[in-house]
């Protein structure tokens, strides 16, 4: 199955996972989100009480137009080789305690372990916040491999 949506302002179509009604909810940009495969359990992350939205590691995300987010506009002269301009005014952040951050889109892909931390479990001092509630560990931190209750540690 192929899910069409956009991330960082660019349309993408990914065949990762499967499309189904089990991921539909108002905070998603589409009613059916990409679901993780058996080896990609960290691709989707719970939002609010139920269901989930897809993470950048799935090459599929949700718009997260509503819910907890940060306002503002971030522009980039060039993204990759396309030279396109990306402007995002709202993104998903389940933990409202981490506010006022401004990071480049898609920063998750540059992390050693993109699914190491999630903001509502991990310590803010240990994790670098990113889009859609997922965060990357800072160089001096290491988190549990699972996303159930990741905890930052001083060393790996």
Curated annotation (Swiss-Prot):
It comes from the Eukaryota. The keyword Acetylation applies. One of its GO terms (cellular component) is keratin filament. Sequence repeats lie at residues 26-35, 36-45, 46-55, 56-65. Keywords: Acetylation, Keratin, Repeat. The modification N-acetylalanine is found at residue 1. The keratin products of mammalian epidermal derivatives such as wool and hair consist of microfibrils embedded in a rigid matrix of other proteins. The matrix proteins include the high-sulfur and high-tyrosine keratins, having molecular weights of 6-20 kDa, whereas the microfibrils contain the larger, low-sulfur keratins (40-56 kDa). The source of this keratin is lincoln wool. This is Keratin, high-sulfur matrix protein, B2B. It comes from Ovis aries (Sheep).
